[in-house]
Amino acid sequence: MSTPDNRSVNFFSLFRRGQHYSKTWPLEKRLAPVFVENRVIKMTRYAIRFMPPIAVFTLCWQIALGGLLGPAVATALFALSLPMQGLWWLGKRSVTPLPPAILNWFYEVRGKLQESGQVLAPVEGKPDYQALADTLKRAFKQLDKTFLDDL
């Protein structure tokens, strides 16, 4: 996945974008076969919740049993890096331009929203996955579920 050339995205802003993308993406079961985001978001949320305590427990357990400090720290750092890897991936995905097949579907969903009377801001440049997430979230709130039939 490559980021668009017209946007400068630094390493740390990807985490912020990933957090925003995970909150924006609609976790609908009908989207799961097409988009991997549902699984990645669920696992990232799980990792954010449970990996820090697991890292602390692992560190304390290995030190209490007289284990070496090096492997204990390495294991704890690996456990702490898992949520960051998920957020980084989501951030990269959010700024990735849509492929042609999904791009056509994106414009169809936007057209259905506009036909239903919704006012949408014009799309600037090539739409990315964040724009798709915003559009899908709005479509799930405003439209009936039949807009997914041609997915």
Swiss-Prot record:
Is Membrane included in the keywords of this UniProt record?
yes
Q: Name one GO cellular component term.
A: plasma membrane
Which residues lie toward the Cytoplasmic compartment? 1-45, 92-151
Q: Which UniProt keywords apply?
A: Cell inner membrane, Cell membrane, Membrane, Transmembrane, Transmembrane helix
The record's subcellular location field reads: Cell inner membrane
- Provide the membrane topology annotation: Multi-pass membrane protein
Q: Which residues lie on this side of the membrane: Periplasmic?
A: 66-68
Q: Name one Pfam family in it.
A: DUF412
Q: What residues form the membrane-spanning segments?
A: 46-65, 69-91
- The source's superkingdom equals Bacteria
Chief localization class? Answer: membrane
- Give a yes or no for keyword Transmembrane in this entry: yes
Family, according to the entry, reads as follows: Belongs to the UPF0208 family.
Name of the protein in question: UPF0208 membrane protein YfbV
Q: Which organism is it from?
A: Shigella flexneri
